[in-house]
Amino acid sequence: MIHAFIKKGCFQDSVSLMIISRKLSESENVDDVSVMMGTPANKALLDTTGFWHDDFNNATPNDICVAIRSEAADAGIAQAIMQQLEEALKQLAQGSGSSQALTQVRRWDSACQKLPDANLALISVAGEYAAELANQALDRNLNVMMFSDNVTLEDEIQLKTRAREKGLLVMGPDCGTSMIAGTPLAFANVMPEGNIGVIGASGTGIQELCSQIALAGEGITHAIGLGGRDLSREVGGISALTALEMLSADEKSEVLAFVSKPPAEAVRLKIVNAMKATGKPTVALFLGYTPAVARDENVWFASSLDEAARLACLLSRVTARRNAIAPVSSGFICGLYTGGTLAAEAAGLLAGHLGVEADDTHQHGMMLDADSHQIIDLGDDFYTVGRPHPMIDPTLRNQLIADLGAKPQVRVLLLDVVIGFGATADPAASLVSAWQKACAARLDNQPLYAIATVTGTERDPQCRSQQIATLEDAGIAVVSSLPEATLLAAALIHPLSPAAQQHTPSLLENVAVINIGLRSFALELQSASKPVVHYQWSPVAGGNKKLARLLERLQ
């Protein structure tokens, strides 16, 4: 049978009540206990789950409904649960030692007075009340993150349209994850700082993408959630467009990564055009969409979270290196490789980056010869007639490198350093000497940038790390792969043109939060030393929305 009682005028968040429900369900002579606020949606849930009691007809959204399933008919069971509930609520009010300093208020005005620099409202109340609170936040020029779900599509469109008109951002509804300016919002991870700005219409998608970025040794600037419906045909990607504009204006976000559930096709095209407008290297992952091309201008398409993370990290490293070098903006690329397969892959990759065709005939080891860009395989038979392979004797390559001193139109030199048994004792040292001769023969305004990969292991006779150190100490850029080497070379010759720099939005510089709903979110922000005020909201006028709006206007 069901025992029941109501605790009047004691609004609590749903997570706290679920925890209390589990604790009370462990009581003696009790099968199960359900503790919920008396909202219409919760009453319907109590009915469908078999916990309904007619006493709940008198409950308002500010009242706690307690339903106890027990085989015993003893009325004292309800009394015992009532006492335990009072104790649980008392402990909740007192909180832990870390929560005693949490600033708590019961009115909007008080929240804004306590935190005058507030620029974000984090809303996690029942969906039927969330939209009204979000509008009130927009009234106060606050950005909004709506963790709440069960918000109508019409309300979402209205809120996001209004926010965009005001130059604000609405994340959500049903937005579970954001990490902005180092501030963890709802479900978030502690991320290393980097130069990748993340946008997502998928909470766990953002978390997995960011986790993979961290595992690869890179970091993020921000991760902006949108809510799962943002890229639907009806919503039209309103918040996605705002987020892209915000990160476009953020100097620290040099690379962008975007992940979403399957979008409407018209919206996808609109978002891709907005990505292009940023001018920044951008990785786009539209789950369920198979791109016709791997790259469209400054937009790289991925087909999985793992691939998106790897691409973002690759672009992150390339962009950081490119920005650390004086722009070339013209000139040609020359690749002098000792390994045939390495030369072939480098040629194919570079041809794709430059929009040219790789050489099909490979005459005299010429793997690429287009628009004055060349990739040559010096291990080709043409170069080994009467002389050792260049991995054994690097004399020929070193001479060709030195000869580049008289070819100032060549601005970027691609190289491989292959070590191991059979290879020359110190290929890096002889390569550095040849490159330095070429550089010395040029004018100061005619630099020759060198980019190298090293093939081999730490246990090889030449020692991988020692070879890398020799190259880097001389000023040669050492990268981990041919895709990174060729992409960096192309980026130096043909750099992307970011959109005109704008002022970084204040939200991306510092986040100060008015938390409305789940107390745990405020405690987590406090533990992260982020400015937060907890607004202990409860339904106004007993949940009567018309009367609540009237009272709001009278204030």
Curated annotation (Swiss-Prot):
Disruption phenotype: The deletion mutant cannot produce oxamate during anaerobic allantoin degradation. However, the levels of oxalate, produced via a glyoxylate shunt, significantly increase. Keywords: Magnesium, Transferase. It catalyses: oxamate + carbamoyl phosphate = N-carbamoyl-2-oxoglycine + phosphate. This is Oxamate carbamoyltransferase subunit AllF. Optimum pH is 9.0. No enzyme activity is detected at pH 6.0 and 7.0. Activity increases in the pH range of 8.0-9.0. It is an enzyme of class 2 (transferase). One of its GO terms (molecular function) is succinate-CoA ligase (GDP-forming) activity. Belongs to the AllF family. Induction: Induced by allantoin under anaerobic conditions. It comes from Escherichia coli (strain K12).
